[in-house]
Amino acid sequence: RGGEVENIFIKDIDMKDIPAEAIMFGRYYMAKDPVALSGEKRELPKVELKPVDETTPVFRNFHISNVYCSGAEKGIFIRGVPEMHVKDIVLENMVLQSRKSIDVQEASNITFRNITLVSAETNPVVDVTQSDGLSFDKIKISEGSALFFRFSGGKTRNIQIKNTDLNKAKQKTSFELGAVEKELNVQ
């Protein structure tokens, strides 16, 4: 835990058969996975806010573009810590074929632009927890996906979706565990 990673530019990447996440930011080692296991009740992880110091991990100012991934456990996984979100990231021009698509936790000011998601598990395709200032522009998913976007947590705010056909999914959005629909702007 700790250290700064910032001002990184990555482009023109082809990946195949990635056993974990194709694109991953951050680690919060002490968090309970917010995905409920069989028989468990889904709830937000209990977190202990720590003061920001030299041990606080910092991930910010990334630009990743022109990525093709054929096979991964998860396409994009972003997980910050409550006291220091992963922030200021642009992810664009991607085709990601994976079991799960996008999982964002404790993140701020993230732009997802022109991304095609082909995922085996579609409930949800995009999962957002305790994050703010996210923009989803030109996101494409498979017709008949179960749930396009799931938003969780009372700190999930200022989410924008534009140029995206939400009707591809059986259910467009869900708001859980304190997330509210008024924080979503669909254009």
Name every feature range the model reports, one short phrase each:
Residues 1-187:
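Extracellular/periplasmic carbohydrate-active domains that bind, remodel
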